[in-house]
């Protein structure tokens, strides 16, 4: 290889390397978008809940924000502690993004009153966070919300703790549409498994994709 060719390769490699490093540092993902799976079939006006501060919350009240939606219950003896521990990691990594909110809904509203959820939030270490709300309300409406986004939520005497729910979260964009990555195999991922720490990277990466898309939309650059 000639000296001239080596110099040319160096001129190409250095800028590309610096660009990739800047992406890694900034957390910006530029190479893809997420599949739009559409708006769920429910009347969002009819679904009204309360958060851990006993403030009214509905899906419409988070319009304009990217939502990370999940379901749990405070007395869950199995997967919930790990789910919310891993969600906290995602929350902490994404805290700097303005138009983002985490919504965790109980499947046991009889037990999980606003006061109980507020204590749960404090114990999780996010008591002062304005980006994470813990939601309670009528069980039928909570289960309807879950099912509308293809998540499981129901009372089930055969399940540990008496309730069954998905161990995954879904991503909802600022217009209420369900969004998801396409896997390397060409399948729609749909929901983001919260049971293992290493799987949280998928969720964090895809939130960053939506954040970038949302910024472009707000700037009129669709």
Where in this protein do the model-derived segments appear?
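N-terminal targeting signals for export/organelle localization
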Residues: 1-48, 213, 217-222
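Short loop/turn microsegments at loop-to-beta-strand junctions
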Residues: 44-45, 66-67, 166-167
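Hydrophobic alpha-helical segments, especially N-terminal targeting/anchoring helices
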Residues: 50-51, 172
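Short active-site neighborhood of thiol/selenol oxidoreductases, capturing the structured segment around
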Residues: 57-87, 102-103
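Structural microenvironment flanking redox-active thiols in thiol-disulfide oxidoreductases
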Residues: 83-145
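Surface-exposed short loop/turn segments
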Residues: 148-158
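Thiol-/selenol-based redox modules, centered on thioredoxin-like
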Residues: 157-222
